């Protein structure tokens, strides 16, 4: 799980391009928090600190306790603007968290795809979904969904119903969908095709 990140921010009352430039000269980054029917709060963060955390894996799904003028708010990053050359964070949008669950887009890690049974037999691991949208307990937001695919043979599909999700998480849709397949390259028979040919030869 991603855990909770503790950050401190300052409220700000000056806006516009000039005010943003002045903040950046001071080593700070403008940001805003909104959502959950609350009045938006304009804030600033330490540039080096927020850039450091942004560069860590799965920052966009990171639950944050944000302290502003001695008040704490539970928030999630929503959008991050970067400098086009240096990739330093220039602006951050956060959303307030009030509900017990939150819809999150989470990356998928296909563990063992290079050594999957079907790949070893000449197949190609075809990724259909690189991210999935989950409904998560706000205290158990995962950095990713890890799926072991080492036992997948050629000609098979990995479906959502086969995936064990992290505790407190569920797919937002009950309709089954395919995340990945292993397809045979030209001249490589799938295991299903091979079994059919053996059966026909025996008859």
UniProtKB/Swiss-Prot annotation:
One of its GO terms (cellular component) is cytosolic large ribosomal subunit. InterPro entries: Rbsml_bL25/Gln-tRNA_synth_N (IPR020056), Ribosomal_bL25/Gln-tRNA_synth (IPR011035), Ribosomal_bL25_b-dom (IPR020057), Ribosomal_bL25_C (IPR037121), Ribosomal_bL25_long (IPR001021), Ribosomal_bL25_short (IPR020055), Ribosomal_L25_dom (IPR029751), Ribosomal_uL5_bac-type (IPR020930). Keywords: Ribonucleoprotein, Ribosomal protein, RNA-binding, rRNA-binding. It holds the Pfam family Ribosomal_L25p. Belongs to the bacterial ribosomal protein bL25 family. CTC subfamily. It comes from Rickettsia prowazekii (strain Madrid E). This is Large ribosomal subunit protein bL25. GO terms for biological process: translation. Gene3D superfamilies: Ribosomal protein L25, beta domain, Ribosomal Protein L25, Chain P.
């Amino acid at each position: 799980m991603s855990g909770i990140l503790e950050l401190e921010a300052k409220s700000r009352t000056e806006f516009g391009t000039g005010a943003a430039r002045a903040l950046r000269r001071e080593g700070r980054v403008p940001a805003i928090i909104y959502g959950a029917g609350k009045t938006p709060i304009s804030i600033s963060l330490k540039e080096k600190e927020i850039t450091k955390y942004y560069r860590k894996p799965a920052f966009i799904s990171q639950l944050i306790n944000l302290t502003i003028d001695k008040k704490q708010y539970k928030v999630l990053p929503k959008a991050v603007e970067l400098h086009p050359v240096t990739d330093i964070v220039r602006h951050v949008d956060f959303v307030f968290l009030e509900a017990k669950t939150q819809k999150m887009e989470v990356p998928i890690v296909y563990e063992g795809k290079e050594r999957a049974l079907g790949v070893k037999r000449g197949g190609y691991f075809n990724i259909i979904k690189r991210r999935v949208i989950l409904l998560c307990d706000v205290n158990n937001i995962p950095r990713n969904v890890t799926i072991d695919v080492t036992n997948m043979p050629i000609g098979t599909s990995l479906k959502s119903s086969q995936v064990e999700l992290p505790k407190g998480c569920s797919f937002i849709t009950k309709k089954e969908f395919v995340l990945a397949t292993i397809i045979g390259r030209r001249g490589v028979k799938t295991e299903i095709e091979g079994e059919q040919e053996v059966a026909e030869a025996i008859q």
